[in-house]
Each structure stands twice: as structure tokens, then as C-alpha cells.
């Protein structure tokens, strides 16, 4: 059985770490991780490669990979995004668009689909007012 090549962005977050560990335990995946932070010890051994830095500026790194799946978990959280809206737009919108373009490019080049999973939580809607925090 051939291993599927997987990219997990936001790999150092709570959900990202659990996903990386789950994929590793299941087997059959070669996992490439990406995050602003260095990998925690809990997942260092199961990541075939870690790309550290801002996703928008690291996107070219991923064009050399033939990903089967992309789990896009990287995001600027709502509380930070309210204060640093330009950074949030770069991370949440431009980063997502660049990954979608990567998936489309790879699909076209290799004539195979790249599964793109973009989960979210209720936090994307934000709170109605700052006082609710």
C-alpha cells in the first residue's frame, strides 16, 4: 500500500496535534506539518517534514510535494484577529486562497484530486460584541 502524502497546517494547535497523532496511529500517511511554531515533542517523531513560519510566505515550499490531502487548520483566532485585522486577513484569507490554488495546481498537473479539508469552529462567527468576552 502506498502512503498518502498529507499536509497539516496549524499542526501545533490542539486540534492539529491530535490530528497528526491520529493519522500517525492509523498509519498509511506521510505527514508534512506547518505552523508558526516549532513542533512540540509529542509529534516531532511522526512528522516527515516541518515547515515553520508564516504560511503565506512559505507556500512555495509546498509546490514540490504531491499532496493527496490537505488539512488546513492554520488561522488567526478571533480575539487576535479583532485587534490585528490585516494580519488576520493575510493568514485567514490569503493563506487559505494560496493553499486552494496549490491544491488546484497539483490536481491539474497530476490529473488527480487533492482532498482539501478546512474545518472550523463557531469562533469564526465571533461574538456580537466585545463586552460578551
Give names to the regions the model predicted:
Residues 6-26:
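N-terminal Rossmann NAD(P)H-binding glycine-rich loop of SDR-like oxidoreductase domains
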Residues 9, 34, 70-76, 116-122:
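SDR active-site strand-loop-helix element
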Residues 44, 80-87, 127-132:
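Conserved catalytic-core motifs of eukaryotic protein kinase domains, centered on the activation segment
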Residues 44-57:
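Rossmann-fold cofactor-recognition segment
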Residues 69, 95-98:
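Conserved cofactor-binding/catalytic machinery of classical short-chain dehydrogenase/reductase
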Residues 97-133:
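Conserved Rossmann-fold NAD(P)-dependent oxidoreductase catalytic core, especially the SDR/UDP-sugar
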Amino acid at each position: 500500500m502506498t502512503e498518502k502524502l498529507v499536509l497539516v497546517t496549524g499542526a501545533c494547535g490542539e486540534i492539529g496535534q491530535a490530528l497528526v497523532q491520529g493519522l500517525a496511529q492509523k498509519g498509511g500517511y506521510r505527514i508534512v506539518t506547518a505552523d508558526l511554531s516549532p513542533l512540540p515533542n509529542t509529534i516531532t517523531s511522526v512528522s516527515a517534514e516541518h515547515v515553520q513560519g508564516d504560511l503565506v510566505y512559505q507556500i512555495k515550499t509546498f509546490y514540490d510535494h504531491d499532496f493527496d490531502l490537505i488539512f488546513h487548520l492554520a488561522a488567526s483566532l478571533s480575539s487576535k484577529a479583532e485587534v490585528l485585522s490585516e494580519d488576520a486577513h493575510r493568514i485567514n484569507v490569503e493563506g487559505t486562497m494560496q493553499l486552494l490554488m496549490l491544491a488546484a495546481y497539483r490536481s491539474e498537473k497530476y490529473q488527480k484530486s487533492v482532498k482539501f479539508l478546512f474545518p472550523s469552529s463557531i469562533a469564526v462567527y465571533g461574538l456580537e460584541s466585545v463586552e460578551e468576552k
